[in-house]
């Protein structure tokens, strides 16, 4: 365990502890201690093995969060297999009978695993904190590979801090001062050293984790409140008060009856009109080959809110389009459009040879300019089709005229100015993300609470014994140290209580129904809902 050497007949300050009294325990007392510790050890092993198997068989659990929990389960499994049983044997026998090498190996393994648990909790806390406070920048870097690197560093730091000192200290000082029938860390015989290791290995990490969790909790509550305000502002009554007649998005339009056009499509885009006062318009020259100028447009929403019929047909002003494009358009010789560029690019085409037979393709002015590689965002506009007097060119495309559609752009970047359906989808997505964040925060809070409850009593005794070496009874030392081990038993229970997927997977594995469930799912996708 971290920061202290009570694996032996000495307390943290080096005062000898008489284990002979333990040898005089009654038979039933020994049986009770052995049975209780064996049950706790078995629960620890089974619980953490279930965590590992669940992570292996259930793909839903293979998230970045659970990679850290998997590492924590590995440390807890080591404690459940080795530390609990060896320490119980040492207590009941009253002496160490396995030799000095086995003692040093056990202490190194115990301290490395215990410190790795603390380091993993620190990593989990920082991961949650950055995920909440820096969702855009941090989550892009939050990959399983990076999680593996952080986990490896946690174990490496724990190993470097404890293993060399425990295994090599006797060679550095020239002799082994630990008696043959005792098992303790030689360099932790001084109270001041033990006190310093307890501060560095427990109190500082706990303080950091507590501060991080408080900030995580505040940020999560703030997001919950913001989401509630967003849902309230997007109520049905408020949606009805809006003026959808001033907002239009077109599905996609313009197609020439050439079957090879679809094969030439490379990018998707939408168009949006800017206000006429932002730029001047010009008249484009006619393109000689339209096939290279058609790009497929994905449906954004229904074009049902613009004024229609005669009002549109009578309009004669040239359309003004604001290019907010992030897509590279290769330069095509022989095609020119009259454009004007400021900080943003504005294009004003008056199409002459376009078709509106099927709403699949639209003419893109990006063919006239070589733009930097970027993605296109939504453009807003309306389409006017002159039904009478339409003419066809040699390419088989009819005349169409595009008129700007008024679209009030909200200065507020929230979803209030969006289409109600789109706003609902965005709100739903935010709610789902928030639910996941709250679940992860709940799991973290349960793990931290269990860690603090189980480790604090022992580390308080470490501080007390530094100033009063005979104030802590031997039995209390044993209970406090064993309670630190119990934390490894509680952690898998926390996962099951706070994570429904873990809980369901644990249940299926314990009932030996996991293979049956996989077969049922396979048959379900084949059209059967039950096993024959």
Curated annotation (Swiss-Prot):
GO biological process: dopamine transport; gastric acid secretion; regulation of phosphatidylinositol dephosphorylation; transmission of nerve impulse
Key words, A-Z: Cell membrane, Disulfide bond, G-protein coupled receptor, Glycoprotein, Membrane, Phosphoprotein, Postsynaptic cell membrane, Receptor, Synapse, Transducer, Transmembrane, Transmembrane helix
Location relative to the cell: Cell membrane; Postsynaptic cell membrane
Alphabetical list of Gene3D superfamilies matching this protein: Rhodopsin 7-helix transmembrane proteins
Record PTM Phosphothreonine, positions in chain: 501, 505
Record has Disulfide bond as a keyword: yes
One CC-aspect GO term: postsynaptic membrane
InterPro entries: GPCR_Rhodpsn (IPR000276), GPCR_Rhodpsn_7TM (IPR017452), Musac_Ach_M5_rcpt (IPR000502), Musac_Ach_rcpt (IPR000995)
Segments crossing the lipid bilayer: 30-53, 67-87, 105-126, 147-169, 192-214, 444-464, 479-498
Record's compositionally biased regions (Low complexity): 270-281
Name of this protein: Muscarinic acetylcholine receptor M5
Native species: Mus musculus
Gene that produces this protein: Chrm5
């Amino acid at each position: 365990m971290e920061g202290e050497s009570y694996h032996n007949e000495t307390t943290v300050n080096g005062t000898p502890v008489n284990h002979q009294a333990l040898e005089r325990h009654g038979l039933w007392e020994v049986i009770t201690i052995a049975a209780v510790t064996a049950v706790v050890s078995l629960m620890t092993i089974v619980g953490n093995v279930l965590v590992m198997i669940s992570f292996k068989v259930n793909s839903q659990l293979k998230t970045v969060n659970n990679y850290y929990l998997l590492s924590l389960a590995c440390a807890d499994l080591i404690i459940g297999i080795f530390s609990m049983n060896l320490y119980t044997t040492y207590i009941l026998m009253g002496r160490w009978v396995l030799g000095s090498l086995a003692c040093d190996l056990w202490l190194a393994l115990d301290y490395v695993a215990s410190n790795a648990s603390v380091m993993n909790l620190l990593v989990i806390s920082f991961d949650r904190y950055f995920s909440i406070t820096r969702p855009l920048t941090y989550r892009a870097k939050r990959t399983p590979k990076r999680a593996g690197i952080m986990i490896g560093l946690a174990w490496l730091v724990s190993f470097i801090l404890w293993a060399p000192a425990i295994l090599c200290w006797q060679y550095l000082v020239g002799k082994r001062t630990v008696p043959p029938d005792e098992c303790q860390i030689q360099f932790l015989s001084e109270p001041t050293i033990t006190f310093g290791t307890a501060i560095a290995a427990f109190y500082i990490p706990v303080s950091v984790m507590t501060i991080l969790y408080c900030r995580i909790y505040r940020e999560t509550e703030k997001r919950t409140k913001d989401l509630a305000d967003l849902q309230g502002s997007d109520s049905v009554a408020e949606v009805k008060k809006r003026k959808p007649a001033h907002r239009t998005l077109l599905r996609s339009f313009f197609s020439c009856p050439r079957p090879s056009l679809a094969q030439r499509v490379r990018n998707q885009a939408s168009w949006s009109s800017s206000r006429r006062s932002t730029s001047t318009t010009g008249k484009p020259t006619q393109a000689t080959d339209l096939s290279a100028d058609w790009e497929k447009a994905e449906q954004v929403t229904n074009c049902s809110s613009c004024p229609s019929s005669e009002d549109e047909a009578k309009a004669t002003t040239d359309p003004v389009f604001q290019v907010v494009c992030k897509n590279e358009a290769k330069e095509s010789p022989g095609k020119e459009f009259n454009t004007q560029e400021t900080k943003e690019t504005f294009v004003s085409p008056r199409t002459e040879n376009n078709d509106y037979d099927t709403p699949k393709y639209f003419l893109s002015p990006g063919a006239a300019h070589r733009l930097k590689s970027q993605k296109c965002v939504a453009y807003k506009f309306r389409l006017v089709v002159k039904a009478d007097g339409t003419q066809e060119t040699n390419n088989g495309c009819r005349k169409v005229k595009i008129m700007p559609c008024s679209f009030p752009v909200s200065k507020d970047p929230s979803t209030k100015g969006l289409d109600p359906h789109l706003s609902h989808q965005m709100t739903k997505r935010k709610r789902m993300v928030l639910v996941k964040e709250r679940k992860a925060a709940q799991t973290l809070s349960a793990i931290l609470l269990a860690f603090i409850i189980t480790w604090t009593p022992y580390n308080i005794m470490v501080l007390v014994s530094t100033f009063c070496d005979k104030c802590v009874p031997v039995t209390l030392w044993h209970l406090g140290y064993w309670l630190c081990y119990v934390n490894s038993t509680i952690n898998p229970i926390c996962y099951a209580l706070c994570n429904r997927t873990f809980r369901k997977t644990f249940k299926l594995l314990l009932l030996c129904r996991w293979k049956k469930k996989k077969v049922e799912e396979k048959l379900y996708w084949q059209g059967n809902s039950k096993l024959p």
